[in-house]
Amino acid sequence: MSQGDIIHFTSQALWLVLVLSMPPVLVAAVVGTLVSLVQALTQIQEQTLGFVIKLIAVVVTLFATASWLGNELHSFAEMTMMKIQGIR
């Protein structure tokens, strides 16, 4: 395994982490912005409200994308193990 292969696998792993973490982060950002807007418009100063709603939205997003996340991680791990096995 050359340095180029290691760099390629590392960049693929980092890209996979970025792509797989994007749905919960985007949902948390959008829901947080909407909750903040509603709180500003209604002058509600409850800080736990935004946290609870964001937490619920992120958990729902993780449940909704769990199959996709698992498939992507499994295929990446399988590909990596096949490449490592081919070194010998």
From Swiss-Prot:
Q: Family membership, please give it.
A: Belongs to the FliQ/MopD/SpaQ family.
- Give Gene Ontology CC terms: plasma membrane
As for subcellular location, the record says: Cell membrane
Which residue ranges traverse the bilayer?
15-35, 49-69
Supply the alphabetized keyword list.
Cell membrane, Membrane, Plasmid, Protein transport, Transmembrane, Transmembrane helix, Transport, Virulence
Q: Write out the function statement from the record.
A: Component of the Yop secretion machinery.
- What cystine pairs are annotated? none
- Which topology term describes how it sits in the membrane? Multi-pass membrane protein
GO annotations under biological process? bacterial-type flagellum assembly; protein secretion
Q: What is this protein called?
A: Yop proteins translocation protein S
Q: Which domain of life is it from?
A: Bacteria
| InterPro entries hit by this protein | Bac_export_3 (IPR002191), T3SS_HrpO (IPR006306)
